[in-house]
Amino acid sequence: MRTHYCSAVNELSLDKQITVCGWVHNRRDHGGVIFLDIRDRSGLLQVVYEPENKEIFAIAEKLRSEFVVRVTGIVRKRPEGMINDKMETGRVEVIGTQLEILNQSPTPPFLPDDHQIINEDLRYKYRYIDLRRAVMQKKLTLRHKLNSCIRNYLNEQNFLDIETPMLTKATPEGARDYLVPSRVHPGQFYALPQSPQLFKQLLMMSGFDKYYQIVRCFRDEDLRADRQPEFTQLDIEMAFINEEDILQLIEGLLKIVFKEILNITLPDKLPRMSYKEAMTRYGSDKPDLRNPLELIDIADLVKDCDFNVFSSAANDNSGRVVALKLPNGCDLSRKDLDNYGQFVTIYGAKGLAYIKVNDLSAGMAGLQSPILKFLSETAVQSILNRVEAQTGDVIFFGADKAHVVNESMGALRNKLGHDRNLINSGWQLLWVVDWPMFELDPQSNKLQPMHHPFTSPQELSAEALRSKPTQTLAKAYDIVINGYEIGGGSIRIHQPELQKTVFDLIGIGDQEAHEKFGFLLDALQYGAPPHGGIALGIDRLAMLLTDSTSIRDVIAFPKTQTASCPLTSAPSPAGNAQLTELGIRLAPTITTK
């Protein structure tokens, strides 16, 4: 039907007859001449219809926004003064000789241009119109290019793209499963996979030593800007490797992706930071290194002070006291300070102490803070020295259990960085390594894996693991880009006894382990090779590469914050016949007043 995409029409096409197909993006009447901007996925092209050809001109007069047309004409140079360098085709136009209306459109609920601010629910209800916008076309095209880069790179590295089941068994992976009832097996359910974790490990035990898959995963969890109930990840597993092999593989992949998509050259080797250092300096296991602010421990300086908030946390083995210096922060008003104090309570903090350094040379008289009366001059001076305070700075403090301090002050660090425009431009990629094997659940006080229960400890000894589980480090690693966790992985346990030990430590007894993971434990007995892998979030990576604020902007048909789809009205009720066939009876609806 067409000879060219719109953007392919240029000065090399002058005096040639071309045919394009697309939508009427804009129609303008000027002095009896009709100008059309025709849009396809590649861009815009101006077409001119003159009144001499009355039959074709009459058709052009009927056109409205979003009509679908087929246009034929002769390419000519635009007259001087009408060149539009903002358009890729802005130096040429087409003198229309033929025009066919392929379909009509009523006035759409919004026009697919990039100049309107459109309600998100409306965008998703009419997503097929929203996706016509140039910005959305570019984002999804870039996502395609990202996937192509990944496939080409891994294929060249001798990886095999192998599919794994979508209907599988529910396994505890940290989030709720989406369950699918079985008609053939009444009362029993499949689960949609949260990841292909166990299947890719089984593939390594099957002799396929390099596997990858760009795969859909499902998690029934509360949504955020970077979460969806269904999401896409690059899943990788390799046998007969160590951590260094995987880190080098991903560094090579990211180097190609950034070069081909953004024309940015990444270093051959990315920086690495231990989990402990990341939490100590930034209060986060995914620190944004573009932000210059850091947390500084001061517990040793306030152990004996009269301010109980500080001294009690400083003398608690599970407590922490930190300072966070904000350069030139003295211009913050009392209301600003109160707002930041309210902000940290979201993360469990009971409040936010601060000291304003109005004049460093004036000693205590040059400081402003409600807590100064509880601190000795020596303690205050020691704090100022440690944080290298200057006149005009404000110093915030966090004192509580370490996990509360890390979460609240880490979040405050991020907020201050954005509020005060401290975030440097560019890209900061980082490996976070040497993760703890386990953490204690604050509510149950039971051990739980930091990643998942199939992660190998650095010391391959069941006895050592049992004797000091909270001190054991894992062979685990996360890749962080500009403060976003883009992927994580680990070396896996390949010895059945060690796997049973991990299950036992996290409260999964032999019977439960056999019921949930019997197939894995059986496979581990039949010569499982050392293996490991990683998974990268395609949605998050595409979000960053397109400078989007949400992964919903790089997914063709996303769910809303409430996990619903305005376009299809999913989820929706099931019919009684379907429920009866599946042997399901719904519980009475519970209403609350």
Curated annotation (Swiss-Prot):
Residues 197-200 are annotated as: Aspartate. Homodimer. GO terms for molecular function: aspartate-tRNA ligase activity; aspartate-tRNA(Asn) ligase activity; ATP binding; nucleic acid binding. The record marks 30, 81 as: Important for tRNA non-discrimination. L-aspartate binds at residues 173, 219, 451, 492. It is found in: Cytoplasm. The gene is aspS. HAMAP family: Asp_tRNA_synth_type1 (MF_00044). It catalyses: tRNA(Asx) + L-aspartate + ATP = L-aspartyl-tRNA(Asx) + AMP + diphosphate. It comes from Legionella pneumophila (strain Corby). Belongs to the class-II aminoacyl-tRNA synthetase family. Type 1 subfamily. This is Aspartate--tRNA(Asp/Asn) ligase. Keywords: Aminoacyl-tRNA synthetase, ATP-binding, Cytoplasm, Ligase, Nucleotide-binding, Protein biosynthesis. The keyword Protein biosynthesis applies. Transmembrane segments: none annotated.
